């Protein structure tokens, strides 16, 4: 919090460091402490500054490691954190499930159809994943809390994840394409006129 306050009080330095960018991606790796996005306004102020004073188009990307799907309680905690960040930042937002290449590496022959279908339930959070757990493993006190979490996710239906596999160029390009889309990148550019086919034929 102190670091962000210090940064926001030294905007001349920040402006110099940002320099002049033209059609570039500027990636700002923010701290992972969720309280910065849910309990304090420092990140929101920083985002507002980037948009209004420095005229950047901003897209927040929330990253959740794929190992979270091994623990459903941790996974749904991540879903709630993503939802909280989306609501509090109130900007274009994507949620990304990282390290999906490591998931496939656990299987020598790749993922089966059933395994792929199961993973899809985590890309579009399926509240019934909680119901799949063995209730004998859960403390009865948490049953009502689990049901409340499930109901909250169902009511908002805001969170979904894009899978990021660093070994797949297609996966990386999909992420870039989605970021461009939510930021409306390129919409201000002049359309490219098609070539004059008649003149082209005449020159052949």
Question: Model features per residue range: what roles?
Answer:
Residues 4, 36, 72:
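Flexible, glycine- and charge-enriched loops at secondary-structure boundaries
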Residues 55, 59-204:
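Conserved GTP-binding G-domain of TRAFAC-class P-loop NTPases and closely related GTPase folds
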Residues 15-33, 37-69, 81-95:
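Inter-motif core of Ras-like GTPase G domains
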Residues 4-6, 16, 25, 186, ...:
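Charge-biased, low-complexity intrinsically disordered regions
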Residues 1-11:
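Conserved nucleotide-sensing/catalytic segment adjacent to the nucleotide-binding pocket
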Residues 1-3, 32-34, 132-135:
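Acidic/glycine-enriched edge-of-secondary-structure segments
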